[in-house]
Amino acid sequence: MITTDQTVLEQPGTAPSSKIGALATRVRTVNRADASAASAFTLVALFVLQGQWRNLGSGYLYNSGQDQAMWEWFFADAAHSVFHLENPLLSDLQNFPLGVNLMANTAMFGLSIPLAPITLLFGPTVTWAIALTLGLAGTAYAWYWLFSRTVGASRGASALGGALCGFAPGMISHANGHPNFVVLFLLPVIVALVVSIANTGPTVRKTVALGLVVALQIMLGEEPLLIFAIAFGIFAVVYYIGAPRRLWPAVKNSWKSLPLAAVLALVLVAFPLYWQFFGPQSYSFLEHGAMGNDAKALTQFPTQSIGGVFTPGQNVRINATEENAYFGWPLLVLGLVAAVWLWRVASARAAAATAVAVGVVSLGSVLIIGKSDTEFELPWEWIADKPLVESVLETRFALAAVPALALLLVLATDKAFKNGLRPIPAAWSIALALALVPLLPTPLQTVERTPTPQFFSSGEWKNYVDDGSVVTVPLPRPEDARPLGWQIDAGMGFPLAGGYFVGPSDTVEKKAKYGAVDRPTALLLGSVRNSGTVPDITQQQQADARADLEFWGADVVVLQPGRSTVALRSTVDRLLGFGAEYHDGVWIWDVR
């Protein structure tokens, strides 16, 4: 039974039914199935994010590090730009006075701009929670829709595949702090449109729709789109190698429409892309070093799952938000079984090849097993410095293996339950349970965030800020971005020196770095916070402090009591030549 092969990249036509009543019944059944799938996916997403939803006022996803603070700031700044009719692509509310190129910072304008009213009314934490919930549930439903329509699989098998795509270990991991890698529901839509054009021919409607969807995905996340495009390209090549008779009809149907859709997408996002690469505070490339998966990451269970709780493996993850693989060995074994079982099906072969290819790429330049370097070079070594992929984290290519594995399971599940042999459905159901139950996600850990000092939340800061900036001690940076939240709670009413973003580290090569270009005073204050000791302040350091405050356009310097407070306060006193005053929970130096 290999008829499912004909529905993946060659969707068959269906004759209209002459029985209106039967058709209406079928539509109602389909709608109920779709509604049930959407409801189930939404409930699972709410379960995963329950801690955040229960505490929208002060809850913070523990494993996000400083990323949640950064993303909430992105949402708040977009809403501020919309409300004040300002250019959302650049903001000087961080990194004053140079500002931040937000198009070069994955600010997700495709989401942050439409949700600006919600951000303005309820705050960026609500927008953050909506984005993650919508991302998980929407991505699961979009893949379910694709599998049930384009592949032609049963609703049950399609729901299984959609759930795997929407709640895969990598999705749950990124839900801690990377909504741009969670809101992926447009990717299956792109697949559906491309497949429809290739199979049934182009129309103006399809071409325009594809261009619009690609443009919107660019404004949601370019890196996931690039990874997806590479993986889909691998799938298509392998598929047509196995089904060469379908290649020429697909080429004839697509050769005009796909380029036109690409041109339309580029025209729509031409200015934002120009701003990203050539606008103020743009950068040439972001060097991230070796970021490949340890081979054990492919076979172990994810930390935030039932399997990870009861059978944790060696800690080989990059960080809590980058568990991009962690498929678990049972799922890999089941995927292999499905690939062998369906080997005569061209789409199954293509899915298997795609999963293997992107899985190998995700391992990086050198094979690492259990943190041991084997010195065995892998394909990423040869492509890591090529244009477009040079700034991609190679570990994230593992995310593209998920839809491929899901397709294998969808096709195999559909075949198992249509086979007619009674032992097969039962055996396959047991195998699915063994592979997928350990991957069931656990709720993301949520903690209380440190309250915003009353100095900012009460509006007292207005008595100390004219047209200049607020300099916090230490300055906001990737290691501690809490001042971004203070700024949000103050209504985005003042700019901050420093910040957490990606910007150029120099004006020549424009190599990117996280955070602001380090000025002498910022480095000094960071060092004092870490050491807890007061250095001997020199005249040069005092001169540097005056120059830095002038560069930052500082009106007030603010220190919240915490780690190394005494040392930091004494250091700033000596740098400025006068003491601080304590007011509304903070130490302040008025430097106007």
What are the language-model segments listed below?
Residues 44-139, 168-184, 295-315, 369-381:
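Membrane-interface coil-to-helix junctions
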Residues 1-54, 256-263, 340, 346-354:
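Start-transfer (signal-anchor) and selected internal transmembrane alpha helices
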Residues 34-43, 212-213, 236, 248-274, ...:
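Hydrophobic alpha-helical membrane-interfacial segments at the cytosolic entry of transmembrane helices
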Residues 2, 433-592:
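Extracytoplasmic
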